[in-house]
């Protein structure tokens, strides 16, 4: 995974801006990758996986409490994406590419069906009932 990425123009893949709504708040996000991601050469497919991962990994409380965040998605062995998201209109970054994103920054990670925070605490795992995770606070 990427250790740190800030305002990098040398990504192999970069997306346009996308928007979605969560709990009545509109968010904007972009994604980029330094990986070839041969299985993910279609922005629509990547975008669908990103929305699924955001819904799966990020709790409603986190959306209420923060204005911006980074999600590092490891979708396959050879494919990872940095996703930067912030509240539309009142996010802290004038240029969302200025948001640090990577393992050395506070972030949410997704790998092999498991969501974790920057301290590697498991937030959610595929195949494990949600009630099991009530004692594990999600970001």
Curated annotation (Swiss-Prot):
It comes from the Eukaryota. Induction: Induced by the iron-regulated transcriptional activator AFT2. This is Putative uncharacterized protein YBR012C. It comes from Saccharomyces cerevisiae (strain ATCC 204508 / S288c) (Baker's yeast).
